[in-house]
From Swiss-Prot:
Keywords: Ubl conjugation pathway. It comes from Mus musculus (Mouse). The keyword Ligase does not apply. The keyword Ligase does not apply. The lineage of its organism: Eukaryota, Metazoa, Chordata, Craniata, Vertebrata. Residues 107-283 form the FBA domain. This is F-box only protein 17. Residues 15-62 form the F-box domain. The gene is Fbxo17.
Length: 286
């Protein structure tokens, strides 16, 4: 009796069998492979497979399987996506990605819809991802005083007795939203922020969110300046939210900026508490 083929030999045999398929059938087969596996396992097989993964056909088939209202609307827009969209280039046209994926591949890999595009929204990683300016005794990270619903971590950033600010710049194209989709007029950008105060000290909180073009010029702005929280007011969390819609063409970045301080000028960290900041992108159905 002959020796049983090894697992590696069996894998090679299956791979050879697939490579013999006509391109139109191979595209159908590969469209059932998860996006990350397509890139890491299928793309290196051969030049033909690489070209298929780098092109739009497989990714369009994956998007077509979502039959929800949002999925159908997205698929209609995806069919008009340029096949050679320069999905990860800066304003000077320089690329910053190791693979020459089409824009649809990047979208499926990074899945920007529905997820929070703000990184480290609750301070669970310290100040990573944020540009920080410290006033007074500076920013600190502490445990939440009250439960914040839906937060990935029950921690928050805390301000001091002088103005503290921090900012995060979200590159929507780098996160997976191709430029033509942003320019389609059917995209909404939803922002939200949670803030509050200590019971024994009042605070002041400000939020500014700006939509910027590829050169980081401001196009649209939203600002929130709630009334200061007074000392000995009931301790609670408050939410600020806004939806950008019909913002025109050319948007690439979201600049998310927070400001806070206390009202008593106490040494330490008695100012506004901020957490669970979010930027989300979705299809506008109406």
């Amino acid at each position: 009796m002959g020796a049983r083929p090894s697992r590696r030999q069996m894998t090679e045999a299956r791979r050879l069998a697939l490579t013999k398929l006509p391109p139109e059938l191979l595209v159908q087969v590969l469209s059932h492979v998860p996006p990350r596996a397509l890139v890491t396992r299928c793309r290196p097989v051969c030049r033909a497979w690489r070209d298929l993964v780098d092109g739009p056909s497989i990714w369009l088939l994956q998007l077509a399987r979502d039959r929800s209202a949002e999925g159908r609307a997205l698929y209609a827009l995806a069919q008009r996506c340029p096949a050679d969209a320069d999905a990860d280039a800066d304003a000077d046209g320089n690329r910053h990605d190791e693979f020459p994926f089409c824009a649809l591949a990047r979208f499926c890999l990074r899945a920007p819809f529905g997820r929070n595009l703000i990184h480290n929204s609750c301070g669970e990683q310290g100040f990573r991802g944020w540009e920080v300016e410290h006033g007074g005794n500076g920013w600190a990270v502490e445990k939440n005083l009250t439960l914040v619903p839906g937060a990935p971590s029950q921690t928050c950033f805390v301000t001091s007795f002088e103005w503290c600010s921090k900012r995060q710049l979200v590159d929507l194209v780098k996160e997976g939203v191709w430029q033509e989709l942003l320019d389609s007029g059917q995209i909404e950008i939803c922002i939200a922020d949670w803030w509050g105060a200590r019971e024994n000290c009042g605070c002041i909180y400000r939020l500014r969110v700006r939509l910027l073009d590829e050169y980081e010029n401001e196009v649209v702005k939203f600002s929130a300046s709630p009334n200061p929280v007074l000392q000995w007011t009931e301790r609670s969390c408050r939410q600020v939210s806004h939806v950008f819609t019909n913002f025109g063409k050319g948007i690439r970045y979201v600049s998310f900026e927070q400001y806070g301080r206390d009202t008593r000028s106490w040494v330490g960290h008695y100012g506004a508490l901020v957490t669970h900041s979010s930027v989300r992108v979705r299809i506008r159905l109406s």
